[in-house]
Amino acid sequence: MKKDIHPEYHIIDVKMTDGTVIQMRSTWGAEGDQLSLDIDPSVHPAWTGGTSRLLDTGGRVSKFKKKYEGLGF
Protein backbone atom coordinates (compact mmCIF):
# COMPACT_ATOMS: atom_id res chain seq x y z
CA MET A 1 0.00 0.00 0.00
CA LYS A 2 1.13 3.53 -0.66
CA LYS A 3 2.02 5.57 2.39
CA ASP A 4 0.37 8.87 3.35
CA ILE A 5 -2.62 8.61 0.97
CA HIS A 6 -5.22 7.12 3.33
CA PRO A 7 -7.36 9.19 5.72
CA GLU A 8 -6.69 8.97 9.46
CA TYR A 9 -8.74 6.23 11.17
CA HIS A 10 -9.70 7.08 14.76
CA ILE A 11 -12.37 6.61 17.45
CA ILE A 12 -15.43 8.92 17.46
CA ASP A 13 -18.64 9.03 19.52
CA VAL A 14 -21.88 8.37 17.61
CA LYS A 15 -25.06 9.70 19.26
CA MET A 16 -28.17 7.72 18.29
CA THR A 17 -31.65 9.28 18.07
CA ASP A 18 -32.58 7.93 21.53
CA GLY A 19 -29.54 9.62 23.13
CA THR A 20 -27.40 6.49 23.36
CA VAL A 21 -23.74 7.19 22.62
CA ILE A 22 -21.53 4.47 21.15
CA GLN A 23 -17.89 4.59 20.16
CA MET A 24 -16.72 3.40 16.77
CA ARG A 25 -13.77 3.78 14.47
CA SER A 26 -14.20 6.12 11.51
CA THR A 27 -12.45 8.48 9.13
CA TRP A 28 -15.10 11.16 9.88
CA GLY A 29 -14.06 14.17 11.96
CA ALA A 30 -11.24 14.03 14.47
CA GLU A 31 -10.44 11.85 17.48
CA GLY A 32 -13.20 12.28 20.10
CA ASP A 33 -15.67 14.23 17.90
CA GLN A 34 -19.38 13.41 18.26
CA LEU A 35 -21.58 12.56 15.27
CA SER A 36 -25.32 13.03 15.98
CA LEU A 37 -27.61 10.93 13.79
CA ASP A 38 -30.98 12.16 12.46
CA ILE A 39 -32.10 8.59 11.81
CA ASP A 40 -30.54 5.29 12.87
CA PRO A 41 -31.32 1.54 12.59
CA SER A 42 -33.56 1.62 15.69
CA VAL A 43 -36.04 4.03 14.03
CA HIS A 44 -35.40 3.53 10.30
CA PRO A 45 -38.47 2.12 8.50
CA ALA A 46 -36.34 -0.33 6.51
CA TRP A 47 -35.30 -2.04 9.75
CA THR A 48 -38.43 -1.55 11.88
CA GLY A 49 -41.07 -2.41 9.25
CA GLY A 50 -42.92 0.85 9.87
CA THR A 51 -43.98 3.53 7.48
CA SER A 52 -41.47 6.11 6.36
CA ARG A 53 -41.34 9.56 7.91
CA LEU A 54 -40.02 12.71 6.29
CA LEU A 55 -37.34 14.65 8.11
CA ASP A 56 -37.68 18.32 7.27
CA THR A 57 -34.12 19.40 8.02
CA GLY A 58 -33.67 22.98 6.95
CA GLY A 59 -37.25 23.31 5.63
CA ARG A 60 -36.43 21.62 2.32
CA VAL A 61 -39.49 19.34 2.34
CA SER A 62 -41.79 22.27 3.16
CA LYS A 63 -40.22 24.37 0.41
CA PHE A 64 -40.68 21.54 -2.12
CA LYS A 65 -44.32 20.96 -1.12
CA LYS A 66 -45.10 24.69 -1.36
CA LYS A 67 -43.43 24.97 -4.77
CA TYR A 68 -45.38 22.05 -6.27
CA GLU A 69 -48.64 22.19 -4.28
CA GLY A 70 -50.74 23.03 -7.35
CA LEU A 71 -49.80 19.84 -9.19
CA GLY A 72 -51.88 17.59 -6.93
CA PHE A 73 -49.26 15.21 -5.62
From Swiss-Prot:
Record Gene3D superfamilies: Ribosomal protein L31
Record GO biological process: translation
UniProt-recorded Gene Ontology molecular function terms: rRNA binding; structural constituent of ribosome
InterPro entries with a match to the protein in the record: Ribosomal_bL28/bL31-like_sf, Ribosomal_bL31, Ribosomal_bL31_A, Ribosomal_bL31_sf
Transmembrane segments: none
Sorted UniProt keywords: Ribonucleoprotein, Ribosomal protein, RNA-binding, rRNA-binding
Top-rank lineage group of the source organism: Bacteria
Gene Ontology CC terms: ribonucleoprotein complex; ribosome
Sequence similarity: Belongs to the bacterial ribosomal protein bL31 family. Type A subfamily.
Subunit structure: Part of the 50S ribosomal subunit.
Function noted in UniProt: Binds the 23S rRNA.
Record NCBIfam families: L31, PRK00528.1
HAMAP family noted in UniProt: Ribosomal_bL31_1
Protein name, entry field: Large ribosomal subunit protein bL31
Native species: Dinoroseobacter shibae (strain DSM 16493 / NCIMB 14021 / DFL 12)
